[in-house]
Design a protein with these regions (language model features):
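A beta-strand edge to alpha-helix "cap/lid" segment located at domain peripheries
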Residues: 1-26, 30-127
Length: 127
């Protein structure tokens, strides 16, 4: 497992624990999340969901990951399957997730993340 894959594993584990300190340490200052419904959160907004207890992730699996490196930057695309609640409401799902990762002072950190729901493919029908 390379450093980028290890970062992804540590990120998934930290989300499950709600470990704000670990998530803070593994992300750049201007980290941005684009959620599965198109909402955009900056780093503080993203971390506040855990700080306040609004988001509770009971299971997060990050698999089927493919990494492309570009010097001090990388893109990891994988499957993100979660069981979670947000403000007490179920927030389970399976998403295709894109992580943007950059090397800062010799350490890989998450700079951005985008989640897209994985749905069923429906071929077009003839008219």
């Amino acid at each position: 497992m390379n450093e980028i894959q290890q970062l992804g594993r540590r990120w998934a584990e930290a989300e499950q624990r709600g470990d704000v300190a670990a998530l803070d340490a593994m992300t750049v200052g201007n980290f941005t999340l684009v959620g599965p419904l198109g909402f955009v959160l900056d780093k503080d907004q993203w971390l506040d969901r855990y700080r306040t207890g609004q988001l509770v992730t009971s299971s997060l699996v990050w698999d089927d990951v493919h990494v492309r490196e570009y010097g001090d930057a990388a893109v990891a695309i994988g499957r993100h399957t979660q069981q979670a609640t947000y403000r007490g409401q179920p927030s389970d799902g399976q998403f295709r997730a894109t992580h943007v990762i950059v090397k800062v002072n010799g350490q890989w950190q998450l700079a951005g993340m985008q989640l897209s729901p994985i749905g069923q493919f429906r071929p077009p029908t003839a008219s």
